Amino acid sequence: MGQISFKASRCFAFVKESNAIEGIIRNPTKEELDATEALIANRSMTVEALNSLQEIYAPGMPLRNKLGLDVRIGSYLPPPGSPKIEGDLWNIVGMANSRNFDAWEVHVAFELLHPYMDGNGRVGRALWAWKMINDEANPFELPFLQEFYYQTLSQYSDCEVELLREPFKSWETE
């Protein structure tokens, strides 16, 4: 299986755009770039790799694996913090390592779980890029289009999965 290159310039642009989606308007730090490149370089995904990236993006904002570690994202309430969160994250990692799931399915599952207190968006987009690369698609020619990105994530919980499959499929095959 070949792999699409993740050049430093692409990493810089990707992390800068991912930060901008979160309202972080600055150049990526060396630590963010190194951690993102390390995640993308993995041949298989692990919870540890996601945790390492998240710790760079949002230090001190842990996995929500304890009761009371709850978050709210606009009107969306992810599952409450509990030991179950870590098991659910392992399931998402299993999806990521499987050819039976598309990158968008893994990304949406991650975002709906929202496993960390902070940093979920940027880690989720890095997971999406990793999955695209490992499925031999090219995520770096596909801008996130912030408005479409958030609109689609919010519609996911209100729509049939198949209604969303087609737009994402076209992104992955262009």
Language model features by range: what are they?
Residues 1-174:
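FIC/Doc superfamily catalytic core
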